[in-house]
From Swiss-Prot:
SMART domains referenced in this protein's UniProt entry, alphabetically: TOPRIM
PROSITE patterns the UniProt entry points to: RECR, TOPRIM
Keyword field contains Zinc-finger: yes
Domain Toprim, first and last residues per copy: 82-177
Organism: Rickettsia felis (strain ATCC VR-1525 / URRWXCal2) (Rickettsia azadi)
Source lineage: Bacteria, Pseudomonadati, Pseudomonadota, Alphaproteobacteria, Rickettsiales
Keywords: DNA damage, DNA recombination, DNA repair, Metal-binding, Zinc, Zinc-finger
PANTHER family tied to this protein: RECOMBINATION PROTEIN RECR
Protein name: Recombination protein RecR
Amino acid sequence: MNKTNDNDIDQLIYLFSKLPGLGSRSARRIVLYLLQDKDVRLKSLINNLVEIDKKIVKCEICGNMDTENICCICSSEYRDKSVIAVVETVAELWAMERSSNFKGLYHVLGHNLSAASRQNPSILRLPELLKRCFAENIKEVIIATNSTLEGQTTAYFITEYLREHPAKISRLASGIPIGGELDYLDEGTLSAAINLRQPFE
């Protein structure tokens, strides 16, 4: 229980505690850190969040987050536009970009499939992916879903969905442990997984 009568502070702690990787104790520490220097720390955070809320949009093509409707990756003339890496979320896209090893395009699914919960595959952006493969003459689709059970389930579903397209379908290779999530891998491991990707059937 917090030593305060201010419900707003309690609500702020609660909101921080819902962020990935944070619990109530870490959330309290963050809130205290911000409040101890409100004029600099808190106001700076507030101003930054307001600007992000105004500027950041989802890329109309791949689903990345950027300040333009077409993100800097999709609009770049230096990317290999014959290859698409299919990732579960923007977090995995950013992880692959940190590796500086992949120079193709991306397609963010937004979700994965859980065999246990029997989710509807329509939650994935697969119709958009297939449309891109035909429209952009894609030669290779790299399935870069996580090595979790949900990621594997999603990978197999993607493969079945793309069978009518002639593009080569590959999967990130060794270096990713079973149950591993791309966002937590170091750049060297992820680079090796990209370079050693395997055909996926």
